[in-house]
């Protein structure tokens, strides 16, 4: 597959080209919950520029062995292949990918509490693992897929896989605390409104 690869950090951001296109091996299913996604679009955000300049090298690459790597953590595309335990997704389904992959497939305590950002063995494609979405294919976990309606194209939603899903999660968690009476019955809505 073709991929855009970062080979060196550029602290001064003066290089004319930061990534180069090269052939990489296609990702392979390893776990029964793995999914290979054909990337339709990958967003670029300020985080990517911080990666290029090495601003987070002390966090994401403390040993200095992460490069070369394929960047890209804001990804959307179509399901290409699914592991044997994957249900609810099939080849061709349009999806957006949550950027954090839990190494425990959601079974660790933090994931069960809805704190995936603190997942045990968590991986962040294009940030702390070498395989990101600036490629034709990306391996992820079924837990990280959100099926898209067919009226949405991956190019229209890829940037939302980071900032958009982050905001969505905050709203989803907050709503149960803001209007708790709405969670029980529709009759309670009249009581809440006054």
Language model region names:
Residues 25-43, 57-109, 149-151:
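Glycine-rich beta-strand-centered segment in the early N-terminal region that forms part
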């Amino acid at each position: 597959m073709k991929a855009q690869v970062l080979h060196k950090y550029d602290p001064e951001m003066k290089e004319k080209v930061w990534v180069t296109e090269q052939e990489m091996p296609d990702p392979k299913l390893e776990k029964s919950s793995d999914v290979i996604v054909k990337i339709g679009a990958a967003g670029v955000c300020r985080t990517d520029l911080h990666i290029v300049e090495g601003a987070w090298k002390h966090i994401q690459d403390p040993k200095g062995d992460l490069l070369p790597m394929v960047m890209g953590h804001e990804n959307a595309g179509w399901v290409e292949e699914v592991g044997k335990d994957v249900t609810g997704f099939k080849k061709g389904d349009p999806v957006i990918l949550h950027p954090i992959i839990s190494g425990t497939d959601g079974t660790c305590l933090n994931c069960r509490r809805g704190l995936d950002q603190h997942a045990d063995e968590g991986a962040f494609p294009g940030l702390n693992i070498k395989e990101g979405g600036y490629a034709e294919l990306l391996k992820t976990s079924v837990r990280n897929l959100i099926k898209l309606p067919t009226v949405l194209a991956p190019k229209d939603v890829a940037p939302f896989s980071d900032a958009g899903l982050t905001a969505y999660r905050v709203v989803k968690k907050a709503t149960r605390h803001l209007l708790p009476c709405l969670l029980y019955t529709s009759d309670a809505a009249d009581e809440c409104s006054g």
